[in-house]
Every structure is written in structure tokens, then in C-alpha cells.
From Swiss-Prot:
Protein name: Probable voltage-gated potassium channel subunit kvs-4
Organism whose genome encodes this protein: Caenorhabditis elegans
Assembly and oligomerization: Homotetramer or heterotetramer. Interacts with unc-101 (via N-terminus); which targets kvs-4 to dendrites.
Tissue specificity remark: Expressed in the cholinergic motor neuron DA9, mechanosensory neurons ALM and PLM, and the interneuron PVPL.
Entry-listed glycosylation sites: N264
Cytoplasmic compartment residues: 1-231, 297-313, 367-383, 467-503
Subcellular location(s) of the protein: Cell membrane; Perikaryon; Cell projection, Axon; Cell projection, Dendrite
Motif (Selectivity filter): 430-435
Pfam family, one: Ion_trans
Disulfide feature: none
Predominant subcellular localization, coarse grouping: membrane
Stretches within the membrane that do not traverse it: 418-429, 430-434
Keyword Cell membrane set for record: yes
Length: 503
């Protein structure tokens, strides 16, 4: 008897718990499966006040706070057909509320819901499932679907920009007013550069001898524009390599000749050595080519002030600056031999001669790899500045510690904090020349801390720099293809040109 009573109570309790769970599921949509959650949200009855309407939870398809008509607990097929449009795009099913499509007010889908099924612009209509079939790629339709939900057009990085343009044209959506700012803000600078490149022919048209100047400019600045431009670029690279080779070979004792006897600061005589005359002649030939190249570029340029300020042109000027100064001194009757007795002037002359090594940077004009490296450093300028600041702080901190710990030791070489700074830089960069080493136990502990901090400080920005390099490489990779594709869309709008450049 007691067991029967207990069993009945347990059954009653289980039935009560089940009823309570069903009741909670009706009140709280979080217990409803995800697939049915949309229908449950649309089944939420119309609330009476604005305060209650704001608290109605809806998802992306339905706007928050928007008043809904009363729905039954479960929508039937007839109600779904009246409120929704079913799409089958390339075998993948989509569903949108008709109110959402009307709210955007544009596109092929707007015509689809406003016309009868017989007059629809779909490729087919499946009467069994009430689906409109479109023989289009579903991966591209996701962009259109997101546009109807959010009102903006985003571009995934894994899709071809030309395909996106064609897909938007098919769905009769013009991206002028709907392109998301996040998808074009990064490319503003690149777009400005492209506009400038497209406007250069127009700039030359307004100048005297504009056509001739434009042809010469393309030969000098656009190596890929013609065969003459490629030949000119090859000659420039050859002259750069010859000039650098002459500078390097001129330092070999076997290729040097004695000029005259001179006295050093202590009064001792020494024989001054100079490179062989043949190397000097080669240097003059290279200088003539570089000067001709730079002068011709400035002569035919449509915007000389802007051309003068460009980095690569500044490098070209520095490469010929020693020769220009030497020629100016000769014009005024001053030779470099007369300046050798003046300590400061002779130092300036030597510094100007050292500037010849800058010519190796001229190769960056014809090397896409060097250009990518320069853009990577420019993109990583903030991270490099942060690393330099942290390294400088660590150098000052550890060098001061090791100086005061080591300066009183008889065998110590840490005679000053600047000397300790040199040791700290070598240590933190894990180079370790070994010319300065701590001898005390506290000094060695400080050295251990400097090594550990150096590894951490130098390792952290590396990942950021590599990431920036990958981004630069990714943007540079399709640059030529985008330029070609844009030329096939001469009437493309500004937004379409941005889409063509985003990947």
C-alpha cells in the first residue's frame, strides 16, 4: 500500500515537473531550439506600451522595438508564405521576411515579392516548397543576404572583387551608398595613389611638350610600360652595380696606388693610398649617368616639387651629392687637395664620399621585395618605436646597475656608464662580443636579467612585424591584377573601384 502511494506521488511529481518545464519553455525562448527560435520570436504577441516593445527580444531578421502583428503560437504554411520569401540559391536555402526586403527598397528581391509567381524573375519556382530558385553561387549571395539584414555591403577577403561586382549587378544593388566603411577605409591611400596615377596623363596634356615629357617620364619611372623603359631600367641597375663594385674594390690594397707622403696628428709620416685611376674613371662615368637620370627626371616631371620630395628621388640626389659639391668647389677654384689640411672640411669631404654607398638603395626602385620591406617598416613604425623605447629604458637601467657594481673591481673595464651602455646593448641584443664582461656575482646576476629582458623585448615585436609583412604582401600580390580589372570597368563608380582594390 505504501509503495503504491509513493509510486503515485513520484508519478505526480514527474508530471508536474514536465508541465513546469513546458511552461518555462513557453515563457523563456532560451530553452527553445535554435532552429525554432525565430518563429517563437515572431509569435511574441504585440505589447501594449512602448516600454514593453523595447524589451521584446528579436534577432537580426526583425528590428528591435518594431511592433508586430499578433501571431498564433505556431505559424502554418499559409502564414509563412504571406510573411516570408523562400529562396534557393545554388542549392542552399535562404529565407527573408518580406518587410525586411521592402525596408531596403532596392534589388531584384523587391521585384520578386511585388510580382506574381508567374511573372517572377527567378530561374525556377518549386511549388512543393514554395521556393524561388536562382542559379547563382551561394557564397556570393551571402553578401546580398547580409545587405538586406544590415543595410551595408561587406566584402569577405576570400572572394574575388570582380565576382562581387557582377553579383551585385545581378541582384540590382549599386554599392555607391551601401559599401561599409570598414571595407574601404584601409584602401583610401591606395585609391588616392591610383587616382593620381590615372590623372598623370591629364597633367602632362596641359604642359608644354606634354606628350614628349610623358613618354620620357614613363621610360624613367615606369619600367613595365614599354621595352624602352625596361632597357633603361636594366641600364640603371647595371650602373648601380658597377658603382658599388668600384667602391668595394677600391678599398683593396692590391687595387690602390701611393699618392704622396703625409703627416698624421702625431707628426709621423705615412703614405696616402688612393684607388687606381681606372676605378676613378669608372666612377665618373657612373656619376654622369646618375646625374643625367636625375636631371632628366626633374626636367620632364609634371610636379617638380612633389617629385623632389619623394623618398627614392631624395636617395638619387644623395647618391650624386658628393660629385655635385666637388664640381661646385672646382668652379670656385677650390680643389679637394687644398681642403685636406683643414680638419673639419676634410671630414666633410670624407662623409660625402661615404654617401656613395647610398646608391645601393637605388635598387629599391626596381625591386618589389625592397619596396615591400620598406612598406613593412613603415607599417611597423609604432611597434619599432615602442621596442626602441623599451630597449633604451632597459639599457639605461642595467648599465647603471652594472657600473656601480663593477667600477670598484681592479680588473673591471666598466669605467663609465656610457661604456656600460655599450656592454648592455651588446648583451640585450644577444650579440655578446666579450670585450666587456662583469666579474662580480651581483654583476653577473644583472647581466642575466639583461639577457632575459633583451630576449623578451626583441621577440615580442617580431610577430607584429611579420604580420605587417604578410598584410603588405597580401595587398601587393593582386595589385597588378586589380589594375587590369579596373581597366575593364571604365565606368566603375568610386565604391566599385574600392571593392576592386580591397582584397
Amino acid at each position: 500500500m505504501n509503495s503504491a502511494i509513493m509510486q503515485g506521488a513520484a508519478m505526480a511529481t514527474s508530471h508536474g515537473i514536465a508541465r513546469l518545464n513546458r511552461h518555462n519553455a513557453q515563457r523563456n525562448h532560451f530553452h527553445i531550439p535554435t532552429a525554432n527560435r525565430l518563429f517563437y520570436q515572431l509569435q511574441t504577441p504585440c505589447t501594449s506600451t512602448e516600454e514593453e516593445r523595447r524589451t521584446v527580444q528579436t534577432d537580426d531578421v526583425a528590428e528591435i522595438g518594431m511592433q508586430r502583428p499578433d501571431y498564433q503560437m505556431y505559424c502554418g504554411e499559409e502564414e509563412i508564405s504571406e510573411q516570408f520569401v523562400k529562396l534557393n540559391v545554388g542549392g542552399q536555402r535562404f529565407m527573408l521576411r518580406k518587410d525586411t526586403i521592402r525596408r531596403r527598397g532596392v534589388g531584384r528581391l523587391l521585384d520578386l515579392i511585388n510580382k506574381p509567381v508567374a511573372d517572377s524573375n527567378a530561374d525556377a519556382f518549386f511549388s512543393s516548397t514554395s521556393e524561388f530558385y536562382f542559379e547563382r553561387p551561394p557564397s556570393l549571395f551571402h553578401i546580398v543576404y547580409q545587405f538586406y539584414l544590415n543595410g551595408v555591403i561587406h566584402q569577405p577577403s576570400n572572394l574575388c572583387p570582380v565576382d562581387i561586382i557582377e553579383e551585385l549587378e545581378y541582384w540590382r544593388i549599386i554599392p555607391d551608398q551601401y559599401l561599409a566603411s570598414c571595407c574601404c577605409a584601409q584602401q583610401i591611400d591606395d585609391d588616392d595613389e591610383e587616382v593620381e596615377e590615372q590623372d598623370k596623363p591629364n597633367l602632362f596634356k596641359t604642359l608644354r611638350f606634354g606628350e614628349i615629357r610623358r613618354c620620357v617620364w614613363n621610360i624613367i619611372e615606369e619600367p613595365a610600360s614599354s621595352g624602352k623603359a625596361q632597357a633603361f631600367a636594366v641600364c640603371s641597375v647595371v650602373f648601380v652595380l658597377i658603382s658599388i663594385s668600384g667602391l668595394v674594390l677600391g678599398s683593396l690594397p692590391e687595387l690602390q696606388v701611393a699618392t704622396k707622403q703625409r703627416n698624421n696628428l702625431t707628426g709621423e709620416e705615412f703614405t696616402e693610398m688612393e684607388p687606381m685611376p681606372i676605378l676613378g674613371y669608372i666612377e665618373y662615368v657612373c656619376i654622369v649617368w646618375f646625374t643625367m637620370e636625375y636631371g632628366l627626371k626633374m626636367l620632364v616631371s609634371a610636379e617638380r616639387s612633389k617629385t623632389f620630395r619623394q623618398l627614392l628621388n631624395i636617395i638619387d640626389l644623395l647618391a650624386i651629392l658628393p660629385f655635385i659639391i666637388e664640381m661646385l668647389l672646382l668652379i670656385f677654384g677650390i680643389s679637394t687637395e687644398q681642403l685636406r689640411d683643414l680638419k673639419g672640411a676634410f671630414l666633410v669631404i670624407r662623409i660625402l664620399r661615404v654617401l656613395r654607398v647610398i646608391r645601393v638603395l637605388k635598387l629599391g626602385r626596381y625591386s618589389s621585395g625592397l619596396q615591400m620591406f620598406g612598406k613593412t617598416l613603415k607599417a611597423s613604425f609604432r611597434q619599432l618605436g615602442m621596442m626602441a623605447m623599451v630597449v633604451m629604458t632597459g639599457v639605461i637601467f642595467f648599465s647603471t646597475l652594472v657600473y656601480f657594481l663593477e667600477k670598484d673591481e681592479p680588473a673591471s673595464k666598466f669605467h663609465s656608464i656610457p661604456a656600460a651602455c655599450w656592454w648592455c646593448i651588446v648583451t640585450m641584443t644577444t650579440v655578446g662580443y666579450g670585450d666587456l664582461t662583469p666579474v662580480t656575482v651581483p654583476g653577473k646576476l644583472v647581466a642575466t636579467g639583461a639577457i632575459a629582458c633583451g630576449v623578451l623585448v626583441l621577440a615580442l615585436p617580431i610577430t607584429i612585424i611579420v604580420d605587417n609583412f604578410m598584410k603588405v604582401a597580401e595587398t601587393e600580390r593582386p595589385a597588378g591584377g586589380n589594375r587590369y580589372r579596373t581597366s575593364q570597368y571604365p565606368k566603375a563608380t568610386k565604391s566599385e573601384q574600392m571593392i576592386l582594390k580591397v582584397t
